[in-house]
Structure formats: C-alpha cells, structure tokens
Amino acid sequence: MSNRRETRKAAQDFIDNLKPLRRPNSEKIFIEGSRPDIQVGMRQIHQTDTRIVNTRGEETFEANPPIKVYDCAGPYSDPNADINVRRGLPKLREGWILARSDTEELNSASSNFTQQRLADDGLDHLRFDVLPKPRRAKAGKRVTQLHYARQGIITPEMEYIAIRENMARDEVTDEQLNRKKPGEAFGALVSKPITPEFVRDEVARGRAIIPANINHPEAEPMIIGRNFLVKVNANIGNSAVTSSIEEEVEKLVWSTRWGADTVMDLSTGRYIHETREWIVRNSPVPIGTVPIYQALEKVNGIAEDLNWEVFRDTLIEQAEQGVDYFTIHAGVLLRYVPMTAKRVTGIVSRGGSIMAKWCLSHHQENFLYTHFRDICELCAAYDVSLSLGDGMRPGSIADANDEAQFAELETLGELVKIAWEYDVQTIIEGPGHIPMQLIKENMDKQLEHCAEAPFYTLGPQTTDIAPGYDHFTSGIGAAMIAWYGCAMLCYVTPKEHLGLPNKEDVKQGLIAYKIAAHAADVAKGHPGAQIRDNALSKARFEFRWEDQYNLGLDPDTARAYHDETLPQESAKVAHFCSMCGPKFCSMKITQDVRDYAASLENAARSEADSVQTLEVGAAESYSKAESYARAGMDKMSATFKQTGSALYSETHVEAALSTEKEPV
C-alpha cells in the first residue's frame, strides 16, 4: 500500500473510531452561567498531594488544588459526548440564534455553485450526511455580535465568553499559586476580571470580535482582542496534489486537541465545497477561509478571469455553509504593486499575488476594494467577520517594514472603518517576516492606523535561515508581537515553505504557538495567567513528576523524555532526574538545607527558657544551618571533581540506578 493510501486509511480509521480525547488526570467540567443553557466547558487538571515529613519522621499530606485550563476541544474532550463525525456536533448556539427572531430559514441555498454541487449525483459519496438548511438575516436586520453590542445587548455568547476567559480563577486562593510578576501591557486593559459587560463594550468599540456565523451554531463562543487571552489559529486544507476529506477532518479534531482557538480551511484542491461542509459541521471552534482561493478554482486557476459575480457567489456559498470569518485582500491596490518590484521576495501572499495579477492584467482597481461595501452588506446578513488580508506582507526580513507593506496597512485602516458602518466585526492581518528590532513598529502602526481593531499575524518570522524549524523562528516573533498587543497568532509549522503539514506538524506548530501566546499573557500581566506556571513549578520542586507532566502543554512528550533515561517506576517518585542525578539535584539540596534548618530551629525553640533565649537559639540554628549547607556544598564539589568535572554526567544516574540501597 502506498504512503498516500496508508495515510488516508489511518485518517478513515481515526474518524470511524473517534472517541472523546482524554488527558491524564484531567476531567471536563462545565460552569453554568445565569441560565441553564449557558454551560461553559473547561478542563480541570487534578494534582496529587504534597508529602511532608516532619523532624520526627512523621509523614503527612497536603492537598494541592485542581487547576482549570482553557479548553478548545469542545465535545471532543467530553467523555459523556456521543461523537459521530457523520452527524456533526451538537448545535450549542441554535436556541440563542432562534430566540433573537431576526433570522429566517431558507428553503434552498442562495449560491448558484452550491445548487450545482447538490444537483450532481456523482458527489453523493463525498457529501456530508445531514446537510442543514441555511439561515440569513430577515430583511432590514443585522445579526452581528457587533450590532447587538452597539445596541447595549449582552448576548448569551458574551456571557459565555466572560466565564470562559476568567477560567474560575477567583476559586484559586493559594497564595503561592496566585503570585505573579508585574506585567507590561503596553496600554492593554488586562488587570481586572472579565465581565459580560466588559465583553460587550470591547466588541462595541471594535477592539474585539466574536466570530460566530449564524450558520455555525456548533461553535463555542470565543473572543479575539488584545484585552483578552491571546488566541492561536491553525491552518489546514487539502491541495491539488495531496490530502483528503478524511485527513482534513482528522486534522481539525487534532488541532482543537492541541489548542487551536480557530481553524482556517485553506483548501485549494478538488472538492473544496464538500471538504468545508464536513469541517464546519464538526468544528467546535470558528472556521475561517480565504474565498479567493475557491473563486480561482471556479475560473480554472486563471486569475485574469476572476470577476465580482464569481467572487460574490463564493461568499454566499461559504457564508451559508457556516464560515465564521473571511480573509479578504481588499488592500492590494493597483498603485501599490510597483512598490514591490525591488523586493527580494516580491509578493508572497497567495491572495495578494492573485489580486495583484488581476489588477495588472486589467489595469483596473482591485474589485475587492471597489466592491467592499457590497462585501460588508453580505457579511452583516450572516455575521461573518472580516479578516483584512495583508497581501503586501514581506516574505523575507530583507523586505520588512517597507513602503508597500505600510501603504496597504493604511488602506486596511480605512476599510475597517467602512466595515464598522455595516456592523461587521473586523480584524487586521499582519506579517510575515520581520526581524526582532522592527516588530514593535508593526504593532504601533497597526494600532495607530486601524483604530485598535484586533491584529492577527503570521508569526512574524524573525530570521530566514532555518527551513524545517520555522515554528521556532516565527514563535520568537509571535511571542514578542503578542506581548506588544497582537490579539491572535496564526501558527507556523515545521513544514512552512516546504510542504503541506501532516498531523505531527500541526501539533508541533500549535505547541510552539501556545507557548508564545501564554508567554505573552504572562508578560502582559493577565490575571491568572501565571497560576499554571506556579502550579507546575511547585510540582517540580516537590518532585511530583506526574503532576509536572499533566500540567504541561504536552504531557505525553514530557513523560516520554523522562522515561528515556529513567523508565523505572521508582523514578516516578525519585527526587532527581537524569540531568544532574541524585547527588547534584539543586532542588533536592535546597530541600535538605531547608529541612535541616527547620529541625535546628525547632530544637532551639524547645530548649528556650525565654524569648531572649529563643532568639539567640534561632540565630545559632541558622548559623549552624549555613555551616551544614557549606559542608554539603564542599562535599558535592569534591565529588564533582572526582568524577571528571563533567557538568552533566550520566555516571551519577547509572550509579543511582545500579543500587536500590542508596537513599534519594
């Protein structure tokens, strides 16, 4: 069997046998809002107790509280969920949408292309099993979350988001877990608990969006804005040469498991329409697309043959399927194209290059720009958010922050204000390839020109020397720009610039970007962001190995790395790892010093006849503790020299494992 067939069969088996995805020592919990139908899912990680031995050798245990973390997997992480990919996910928001009474169900699809696909019996074997009827706003109505927010309405989606963003952090009362370093938020408002009113106000101001198409009721409400947790997008999609519907659905589920807050379907191959239907119906997160890709397929890949009518029909097709946000390259203007002539890498955006070619071939202005108000009117009828694409983004650090890039950014700032006239939620896309010293300028200019609309960047990649490792090179820039105020990061996988990512590539890209997003939340001083760090650090210091794994982003990998050198069960409770061994573990030495100092202080207290005697005894105890610590360090120093002065020596580990008699 060929590799392609094996991959497709594996994906088919994954779908056929899909069960809720479990994490070790975790459970799915739900926090109820102001009404029973607002049930906000989170993941709760249970910890083991801390073992405490007093000076008399008596053992006690101190409980460690469970840690709640943000969960993007929806029903895929709920052990009670009935998962059936052919039926799709439960329609979480359907009741909320119907209760507003401002939409209507259509008897049939409005898109000519959709009607043609449905009439083609040859596609029946690819079609999603249960196709819902599409909905649209009633005549004269706008059904966007921005419209409701401006009317002063707090929707169930907004309340859901407030609960989700807070993650019940007010339940954490442990002083050690609540410690955090002062943050630098660069003007972001991140110091207070999130309330439904705060969510409404941020959306009303255009500083945040809730991507939530009325035809995607399966999606759990989430928010994108710099005053909220930094979000991460994952790209999936088939191409003309590889991948299948089964593989893309598998990658969707896989993406949500590893923390994708949104997913963009960038399919460019056959069966784009059918693939997208499967993805939307099974997605608990918002789905984005670049409609120009499919429009180009409809004109046989000839950019010059594109026109407004084909593109408009594509927007309607995708909006009625449930796509939550469109990337539109309306800022690629005819007069900007010559600005890229002297670039090292020219125009690297697929959408940008398509529209640049169209503009030059017709010597006319970009039809996405001239029809932008029509696009907004259409989006307002379905609550499709706009992601204004950066078609002029730099494709190398040599082209960073040039005239073409910033000219387009100013145009995007003009377009976002037009979108707001139609109550259309809007975010701005950003680069790209930017060296570290130029990253902040990008964020500053975006805030200046785009009226604080959320920024959404691809990286940026900080160096061009590492093909195969661009999830690292871009993760550096992603952490920086998110700290400065970027609201959502588009992940980059190890296959960037090289090929279509597989499952493992998707995981690696997401882990890298979840690290970047979380690091930015901590740096901004986001309330509660550091709780998980503190819990893991405490577990590490107390040698609670299983808790260390489970509190991490990737427990399986952490456990596997530990077990490569210390596979024994006894090593799961040992007070050392394979890096330093039992004799050189800094944390174990620190614990020994603490314990000895405490024992001497207790002895001094018991012998004291007066307060003065107690004070003198305690001082002497600490002095003795220092002497003990010094003696211990001297002994370790001598041993270190005897073993050849190697900083990290496996000799210590092998010696520890060769005998069970030596205490650890």
Curated annotation (Swiss-Prot):
It catalyses: 5-amino-1-(5-phospho-beta-D-ribosyl)imidazole + S-adenosyl-L-methionine = 4-amino-2-methyl-5-(phosphooxymethyl)pyrimidine + CO + 5'-deoxyadenosine + formate + L-methionine + 3 H(+). One of its GO terms (molecular function) is 4 iron, 4 sulfur cluster binding. Its cofactor is [4Fe-4S] cluster. Zn(2+) binds at H433, H497. GO terms for biological process: thiamine biosynthetic process; thiamine diphosphate biosynthetic process. The keyword Ion transport does not apply. Pfam families: ThiC-associated, ThiC_Rad_SAM. It is an enzyme of class 4 (lyase). The keyword Isomerase does not apply. Binds 1 [4Fe-4S] cluster per subunit. The cluster is coordinated with 3 cysteines and an exchangeable S-adenosyl-L-methionine. InterPro entries: ThiC, ThiC-associated_dom, ThiC/Bza_core_dom, ThiC/BzaA/B. GO terms for cellular component: cytosol. Pathway: Cofactor biosynthesis; thiamine diphosphate biosynthesis. [4Fe-4S] cluster binds at C577, C580, C585. Its EC number is 4.1.99.17. Substrate binds at N235, M264, Y293, H329, S349, R350, G351, D390, G391, M392, R393, E429, Y456. NCBIfam families: PRK09284.1, PRK13352.1, thiC. Belongs to the ThiC family. Homodimer. Catalyzes the synthesis of the hydroxymethylpyrimidine phosphate (HMP-P) moiety of thiamine from aminoimidazole ribotide (AIR) in a radical S-adenosyl-L-methionine (SAM)-dependent reaction. HAMAP family: ThiC. This is Phosphomethylpyrimidine synthase. The gene is thiC.
